Amino acid sequence: MAKVEIYTWSYCPYCMQAKQLLDSKNIEYSEYVIDDDESAREAMVQRGTDGERSVPQIFINNSHIGGNDAIQQLERQGKLDSLLS
């Protein structure tokens, strides 16, 4: 099983969509809620590959996937399941 991590804000609709997709696949993930936590946000930015500060930011097996658009696109292309296995 893949190690999945997601950085979120509490009331972010895109974060909720990404988590719903993972939940629909019964994928366990570690969620880091970074509301008002600048050090956690900086850690997220440092881990990423594009300097992106928006959420969600998703990592699978320590590889930066991107945000909700990226994970939804992987799902539409039929590529997400292989990353998660």
Where is each model-derived feature located?
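Thiol-based oxidoreductase modules, predominantly thioredoxin-like and allied folds used
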Residues: Y29-R41
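Short amphipathic alpha-helix with an adjacent loop that forms part of the alpha/beta core around
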Residues: A43-G48
